[in-house]
Amino acid sequence: MRYLTFALTKGRLARKTLALLEQLGITCEEMKDKDSRKLIFVNEELKLKFFLAKGPDVPTYVEYGAADIGVVGKDTIMEEGREVHEVLDLRFGNCRMCVCGPKSAQELLKHRELIRVATKYPRIAKDYFYNQKHQTVEIIKLNGSIELAPLVGLAEVIVDIVETGSTLKENKLEVLEEVCPLSARMIVNPVSMRLENERIKDLISKLRALIQEA
């Protein structure tokens, strides 16, 4: 039996995924050692391997077959646009992708004015404005604090992930439109899905049952 390899998004998503898998009896004791410098963790008994990666890299590892299965946020799947199968909504890491800005920007959106949009997610923003709203905009890619853009006049609105909305309120910004809901998803390499169909489908069905019970 070959190893099934998991690429998990570092941080909270990895911890939640491992807790979920543990409920199915799938554990990896090596990963619990906080002092470990290992990059790949192995469960020899179940023939499973795990490694941690930055969110945007997870779909890349899965598309190229370096990992059979990945767990990553829906926002990353949409933004990276990789050839992977999205097989399961894990229903944690819930948040929203939204268009945000000062209240005054609402009219600009309503009348589909030519505006500037600052975001870490240019692909998602472009798809939303061009394909769903049919509004021509100038998209500005930023990497840092996106909320700053409307405050200094760089852009009229931003497209960003909203969890609690507290940062928006502190800066007198608000959610103007919701692009889509987000959560952690399981993705699978298309070739792995064919080669290991039984094992992967069994895992998906067990996880789905567990999630529905919660």
Language-model-detected regions and their locations in the chain:
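Domain-level signature for soluble enzymes in the chorismate/prephenate branch of the shikimate pathway
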Residues: 1-214
